[in-house]
Amino acid sequence: MAKGPNNAAQRARKKVKKNVADGIAHVHASFNNTIITITDRQGNALSWATAGGQGFKGSRKSTPFAAQVAAENAGRVAQDQGIKNLEVRIKGPGPGRESAVRALNALGIKIAVIEDVTPVPHNGCRPPKRRRI
């Protein structure tokens, strides 16, 4: 019982182009990768990009340049959706924190607020042991 080609076309979703003027850029900068998600005010994702998804593998993912390329890619897609103003929320200690924000700014998107939302424990879980190199 073969499925017709019509069935596959129904499953493939067409990207809906939204017209959103301002949103939030969530930058998650870990030591291994940088993830940029651009959402509207309600938190619905408009675009996202990762350093690994831009073709960087291994230790090159954790570079500021990889974060810059990922931010440019996510920002361009968001601009196509109509984004003009952004709040930037940065989470994590990674090397791509600053370069991701600079890349978004260079695209011509107006950045209103830069906020650090890195979670800090009030002495919660025991951290991993110290690395000895």
Swiss-Prot record:
Keywords: Ribonucleoprotein, Ribosomal protein, RNA-binding, rRNA-binding. One of its GO terms (biological process) is translation. It comes from the Bacteria. PROSITE patterns: RIBOSOMAL_S11. GO terms for molecular function: rRNA binding; structural constituent of ribosome. InterPro entries: Ribosomal_uS11 (IPR001971), Ribosomal_uS11_bac-type (IPR019981), Ribosomal_uS11_CS (IPR018102), Ribosomal_uS11_sf (IPR036967). Pfam families: Ribosomal_S11. GO terms for cellular component: ribonucleoprotein complex; ribosome. Part of the 30S ribosomal subunit. Interacts with proteins S7 and S18. Binds to IF-3. NCBIfam families: PRK05309.1, uS11_bact. HAMAP family: Ribosomal_uS11 (MF_01310). Belongs to the universal ribosomal protein uS11 family. Located on the platform of the 30S subunit, it bridges several disparate RNA helices of the 16S rRNA. Forms part of the Shine-Dalgarno cleft in the 70S ribosome. This is Small ribosomal subunit protein uS11. It comes from Cupriavidus metallidurans (strain ATCC 43123 / DSM 2839 / NBRC 102507 / CH34) (Ralstonia metallidurans). The lineage of its organism: Bacteria, Pseudomonadati, Pseudomonadota, Betaproteobacteria, Burkholderiales.
